[in-house]
Amino acid sequence: MSSKNTKETNVLAQASILMVAGIVTRIIGVLYRSPVTSIIGDEGNGYYSIAVNIYTMILLISSYSIPMAVSKVVSAKMAVHQYKIAHKVFKCALIYVLVIGGIASLITFFGASVLIPSNQPKAIPVLRILAPTIFFSGFLGVFRGYFQAHRTMIPTSLSQIVEQVANAVISIGAAVLFIHAFAGGDADKIPVFGAMGSAAGIGAGVITGLLFMLFIYSCNKKYFKKEIQKDDTGVDSSYKDIFRIIFMMVTPVILSTFVYNISTVVDQTLFMDIMGFKRMASETAASLYGVFSGKYWVLINVPIALANSMSTAMIPAISGSYELKDYKKCRGHVRQAIHFTMVISIPAAIGMGALAYPIMEVLFPQKATIDLAVSILRTGCISIIFYALSTVSNGVLQGIGKVNIPLRNAAVSLVLHVVLLTPLLYFTNLNLYALVFATMFYAFLMCLLNNLSVRKYLGYHQEMKRTFMIPLLSSVIMGILCYVFYQGIYLILSGIFGSFIHLRILVFICLMISVGFAVIVYFVLVLKLKGITEAELRNFPKGNMLVRMAKKSKLL
């Protein structure tokens, strides 16, 4: 493979690394939420989600978007060999999160009673537990962004896995510990203290991830020093100028990300307020919202994480080629990113809808809400495609310096989202379905507006057949066959083993077999229909092995 082709496919290779990490961390996230939900219940999940949504918004405002900003600014400076300035940006970013993160943590802790909806006071102590995490998250983000700018996603990927493992272990352990230590057997207190313990796991995970990144940085310190020493450009910038660059870059990115994600807080606030207006008990409203955010939202975010990985991985490559005015190469990166994302996201959405019941039965088998959880997952699974595409296009626009455009698009989408959601909640009895429909509408609008903007500012025209039509056709066929296959294998195995194997274990076995069947069917179809080339397949995790298998099976 030529040097040029190697460089062009590097973004996919790096995205694959992040994608694997994203899959692993999301799977861990889903798996640990299952025992946590069994411990704290849907009501506890509701308090946890309310607090986490507020925490996330404050994190976005203070420092969450700093990795993207650091990655973009540092990679742009490195593209023109200004290594001294690149390292100065890194140091200034650390000072930035020290100040801003500290202030945000204090505001969160002391202002929790104001930030939490007035009819959900039990979520206040959960938010206070999360407050210190904001401070440490900023530092973790700076280190991740710095390594991403160096076109290596391995440190970020490993730190994400380490963080999530620590989060999972501490969340489960602390939830049990808090309940036994503080609830005193009171059923009304169990959801609150359980949610507090689960929230403590987030902080433990972030601190563990930060310690890991500090270790990796110390191991590479000599390399960074040599990099600075070989800077012979003679160009330098004052710390004042660099802080201004960071501020000018971070502010619109933060605003864009904030508006892009604030829909969860808006949804939460509208849902709680309107359900309260309809005289629904606060505990019931919290339980319902726990189903939406703690089950449905957790599950659809697994495939969306793949788009986040692609967006994160491609920003340095897009930013670097755009800085060098190599627009053709830049458009090539965009084309690869969107195609790669759709090949994964479309079957994930269809497959999740087809296997909604066994997924819920295995992970969240609470009998009181399982039918509702299955129904909203089947209804809203299509939003995975829209969120994935809007996330990638958001990253493209930020990578080419149009950071205000996603902000505008998100703001327009949010306003129309609220216009739809409010009457659906007020004048119908859709309840959670109103949230599902409104979030689907919001994701679709973001997807549409962002892609129109990419076309306008980059002159990019999307290829449709290989990117959308073939994956969609393959996924629909796969979904139908997978659903029938699951029903058949469950009928057979339950007849043979049903009398001495627990239902949940039996469903899990059938689910795993069905997922394997679905993956094989999808990739056979998409390869036969020429939706993926050999070169593209090599960029998947274990790509060379997949190519050998495809050739042996005469699919390539």
Name each model-derived stretch.
Residues 16-21, 132, 147-177, 393-422:
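Alpha-helical transmembrane segments of multi-pass membrane transporters/permeases
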Residues 1-28, 84, 88, 233-261, ...:
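N-terminal membrane topogenesis motif
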Residues 486-556:
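Membrane-proximal transmembrane or re-entrant/amphipathic helices at the cytosolic face
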Residues 36-57, 122, 188-196, 244-249, ...:
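Interfacial/gating helices of multi-pass transporter permease domains
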Residues 64-79, 304-326:
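Helix-loop junctions and terminal segments of transmembrane helices
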Residues 113-130, 353-384, 497-502:
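Interfacial segments at transmembrane-helix termini and the short loops linking adjacent helices
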Residues 1, 173-181, 204-235, 268, ...:
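C-terminal transmembrane helix end/exit motif
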Residues 10-68, 105, 134, 251-273:
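Signature of the first transmembrane helix
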